[in-house]
Amino acid sequence: MEELLSKQREECKELQSKITNLRKQLKEGNKKQKRALQQKISQMEADLSQKHATERQKLDKGDEETNETQQEDLLNTLLQQMEDTKITTAEKSSVQSSLNTKENTPQQPKKSRNRQKERLERRKAEMKKMSEQAELESEKMADLKNEEKKKFSKILEEAGLVAVDIPADGNCLFASISHQLNYHHNVKLNSQALRNKSADYVLKHCEQFEGFLLDEESGEVLPVSDYCNEIRNNSKWGSDIEIQALANSLEVPVHVYNTEGPVLKFNPSTVKFEKPLCIAYYQHLFGLGAHYNSLLYRDN
């Protein structure tokens, strides 16, 4: 457990360092680009918290199975080491006395055994505390998910919209826009085609996006060419950057409904299709992170 906690503390320090660098970038750029950075920061924090909770739960289960044999294993290991190094009988007797040997000086073994028991009890208490913390974090995630569902239900009811479920496979943004294009404008473009379109636009208008193209794992700013390559060839999640790129390249408005504020409207510089594409942005629907669904009007 000590080793895991040390590793997790280091990971937290690394994350805070990355977040500090990202927050410096929040002072620049437009409102939508700032929102994309803030979403990325929140997602990085949530992902690390969930990762740590899972690691602690796994270690907790493993330690419960091994604690019962720790004392016996420790005794056997030390005695074997004494045989291997051929220490004297007097030295061996001294070590055995400190390791709960009832035959020699009964008071000393009792004291050593009690100290070991206390260490185990402290460790169990710490593990229990960490397990309870993991459960609280899990309950918190469930509460956030339920609260988001309630808010979205009210928002969509008032707007006369209904959500169309899109698979959470890393392509949800592109799949949602693909569904909207086909439904409203009879334009058939799959997720890969939309990935290519957004990457082409970002690459062509790189001056609009430089400094806001982030690596999902490190949170560091990527060169435009590297970022576009990830959008094309990997299941990199789409964000506000891709939404704006697609709105401009497809010449269609995109409206993003969310529970944190008003509808975000991504308007293209020139309009070919007047009817906007409507999608929903979820932060807590899935434990994996952000998710998008397609939205349709009930009277359609």
From Swiss-Prot:
Amino-acid biosynthesis found in the keyword field: no
MF (Gene Ontology): cysteine-type deubiquitinase activity; peptidase activity
EC number: 3.4.19.12
Residues forming coiled coils: none
Root EC class: hydrolase
Any one Gene Ontology BP term: proteolysis
Domain called OTU: residue spans: 161-298
Compositionally biased spans, kind Polar residues: 89-109
Catalytic activity: Thiol-dependent hydrolysis of ester, thioester, amide, peptide and isopeptide bonds formed by the C-terminal Gly of ubiquitin (a 76-residue protein attached to proteins as an intracellular targeting signal)
Localization terms from the record: Cytoplasm
Basic and acidic residues composition-biased segments: 48-61, 115-141
Any one of the GO CC terms: cytosol
Region called Disordered, residue ranges: 23-73, 89-141
Entries under Pfam families matching the protein: OTU (PF02338)
Record InterPro entries: OTU2-like_OTU, OTU_dom, Papain-like_cys_pep_sf, Peptidase_C85-like
Signal peptide coordinates: none
Stretches with biased composition (Acidic residues): 62-71
UniProt keywords, alphabetically: Cytoplasm, Hydrolase, Protease, Thiol protease, Ubl conjugation pathway
PROSITE patterns on file: OTU
Task of the protein: Hydrolase that can remove conjugated ubiquitin from proteins and may therefore play an important regulatory role at the level of protein turnover by preventing degradation.
Protein known as: Ubiquitin thioesterase otu2
Organism: Schizosaccharomyces pombe (strain 972 / ATCC 24843) (Fission yeast)
